[in-house]
């Protein structure tokens, strides 16, 4: 009871602050700020924890998420695949929306479309790809997709947000990803086996403005030559890369993992018969014993255990509130920056200030 009263007090204070900010003249005229404040108030009501999954196209984001879900449902490739923001909701196994997807379109007046992702998997995957089989530009056609699945061993109301790649070629990909990060509470940052590139560093500095909790994951450890560089050694090297390049050597990262998303997925989804293309060409199907070994070799359980433990703990609740307060502070900082800019313009040329800034003098 005490916890509920305390949370309600915090909720009331955040809503009151949001209402006061919404009355500021600079905010009243901005659709962007009004939408942000609406999102914050909605977050107060629902308190759904959101995790963005970010990385280059080649980092294996969709394969990773498929492994987490346990089914090969999201399209995955080394080129531009995730064309739209995809929200993956954790729902109970008996929920009427389980294994369903709702497609939201950009075209005004066009109704949402609900798809059974098991029975109509090809249609579902078409809506997530940059171009579907008819050559339609999905980026322009689809606004977002909500997917409802059950994550085993996770009872929390969690949403994983699959974002377009950092090296996206579609217009607005990067802006869309930044927007989603600003609305989320933590991020899983996926890197290809080569490690952290300059694009990753630039993006991470932007990301750290909005969030505090990061799971750093180097994928594709199955491609390593064990004689030249064992997975354990590569993971230690990657942890040093994160510490020195992202945190400038000042912070020891808490969550760093090396995985094979591919082996984890093949180990879990019994509908997949082959690990690599050459296995398919040779007609050699995976045995149950091999599937079990692939899952163990993937090191996926280490990441999953840490992630689910974090998502089930109190730290998650604090992160939700921190995120809302950061968003409010960002709006206030922007308003203050605009005020200072106008003040400097006024000081430079007081007589002409109203005319230059579209202000009436009578």
Show which residues each predicted segment covers.
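Charge-rich, solvent-exposed alpha-helical interaction surfaces
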Residues: 13-20, 36, 327, 331
